[in-house]
Amino acid sequence: MLKGIEEISATKKRLKIEIPADIVEGEIQKALKEIQKKAKIPGFRPGKAPISIIEKKFGKEAEADVLEKLVSESYQKAVKETKIKPLLPPMAEDAIDIKRNEPLSFELVVEVRPDIENLNYDNIEVEEISTEVKEEEIEEVLQRLSKERGTYEPTEEPAMSEDLVVIDYTTDIGKEAKDYIYKLGAGPFPEDFSKAIEGKKKDETFSVTIDFPEDSIADFAGKKVNFEITIKEVKRRQNIPLEELHKELGFEDSDSLKKYIRQSLENAKKEQALEKQKFDILKKLLETYDFELPEGLVEMEMKRITEEYESLGLDITQHMDKISERAKRNVKAYILIDLIGEKEGVSVSEEELKQEIMNIARRYSITPQGVVQYYMSRDGSLEALQNSVFERKVFDILLQKSNRIKKEEAV
């Protein structure tokens, strides 16, 4: 059936396929007989209408079904025979039609993964990054947690930034409020409003004029407003004493809390170090190897990135160069990872895929079914998840083969 293969470029092949006339006709007759079994023709019992009548009425339908079947089957056989690795569905440059009692001849253009000669990824230099956790880092976390878990308590001291104040106010434009709770420095009023309150104490009353910008809250936008403000209460955040923090967070003692913080920081540092090393390895590979990129794959990636930009409300006309550059980089990275994975015999088993689903479910506190539904909703398959596991396994190999150097030795 495969008559030949023509190399259009490093990323495109033309498959020339011919299916003998007798096979085509045999498939058409099979299709007509299947239709005959179900067709309802006036004057004939189901399944008893002559094949000539079936062909006259349903011939074009049968030919269309057969054409789709034969093109698909012959393409799959040609791919196996030539051992090419298509990246996208094939494209027919010309219309493909069945002509009765003639061979079915057609050509399909296929985008394929380019080959890279002498692909070498041994001893790529990566920086050995320290993941040691220092005591001051633990102390910083403790102080932050102490502040976050603290409560606002009344104070007789003058108000300062980040305090909560309870105020009454009236204005010369008829707007007023009672028992209005406001955090100094946090909006929605301009900074000058907070600055006017800072330094004032409980029970003080004062006046201040504030210029509101056009994009401010609706009642005051674009106006110069005079406020008369009475401070009814000032509250300041009181941090939880460090010696009591472990109880608030459900730990047995302070040492247990510190141990947990240390482990969390260490895990985060290890993850950051790993991502940095993976980035450096990929950067080196991208700089080392230059090859033709499959146009269709680049276009598809550009479309995906464009949709991502649009979802963020960005004007894509101002970012086309960046989108194009990013798409080419992503496709190039995909091809390099795929080639290395193939060379190393990397595959993703059903068990590994299930384990990845379980890991994601635990990480985000959702059910495994929820993970599957999320990926299936994107493109109807788990291919993206499988690719993620494949990529991770490839990078594990690259890291094992890398040359770790200390920071001071890094070039």
UniProtKB/Swiss-Prot annotation:
Localization per record: Cytoplasm
UniProt GO cellular component terms: cytoplasm
EC number assigned by the record: 5.2.1.8
GO molecular function, one term: peptidyl-prolyl cis-trans isomerase activity
InterPro entries (UniProt xref): PPIase_dom_sf, Trig_fac, Trigger_fac_C, Trigger_fac_C_sf, Trigger_fac_ribosome-bd_bac, Trigger_fac_ribosome-bd_sf, Trigger_fact/SurA_dom_sf
Entry keyword set: Cell cycle, Cell division, Chaperone, Cytoplasm, Isomerase, Rotamase
Annotated PANTHER family: TRIGGER FACTOR CHAPERONE AND PEPTIDYL-PROLYL CIS/TRANS ISOMERASE, TRIGGER FACTOR-LIKE PROTEIN TIG, CHLOROPLASTIC
Entry's family note: Belongs to the FKBP-type PPIase family. Tig subfamily.
Protein name: Trigger factor
Organism lineage: Bacteria, Pseudomonadati, Nitrospirota, Thermodesulfovibrionia, Thermodesulfovibrionales
Gene for this chain: tig
